Design a protein with these regions (language model features):
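Short alpha-helical segments that sit at the start of domains
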Residues: 1-15, 79
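Short acidic, hydrophobic short linear motifs in intrinsically disordered regions
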Residues: 23-33
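Key DNA-contact positions within bacterial/archaeal DNA-binding proteins
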Residues: 41-44
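Short, hydrophobic-biased segments on the C-terminal half of alpha helices
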Residues: 47-48
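A short, conserved structural fragment
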Residues: 51-59
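Basic, amphipathic "hinge/linker" alpha-helix immediately C-terminal to the N-terminal HTH DNA-binding motif
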Residues: 62-78
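Amphipathic alpha-helical dimerization/coiled-coil segments
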Residues: 82-85
């Protein structure tokens, strides 16, 4: 798949979601909002963008999960954050 440049906001969401669920199972959007201390509408908008990028799948009732590409990208972001600290 084509390599894309991710905004810092997208990186923050992917890293947090990967930390919350390193297995790539399911995460509730309300939990993401609480973890990042942002509003639910903000989470919804970002999850839509990440879904459009093919990095996660949105299901009913606020359930999302990272695609294999999303999970791999999240792990790379976390590794780069750890390397830079």
């Amino acid at each position: 798949m084509q390599r894309r440049c991710l905004s810092e906001a997208k990186k923050k969401y992917l890293a947090k979601m990967t930390e919350m669920d390193p297995e790539g199972k399911e995460i509730r959007s309300i939990k993401i909002a609480k973890e990042l201390d942002v509003t639910r509408p903000s989470v919804h908008a970002m999850l839509t963008r990440l879904s459009d990028d093919g990095l996660l799948v949105k299901e009913h009732y606020g359930i999302v999960y990272l695609t294999p590409e999303g999970l791999a990208t999240g792990k790379k972001i976390i590794a780069s954050y750890n390397h830079n600290s």
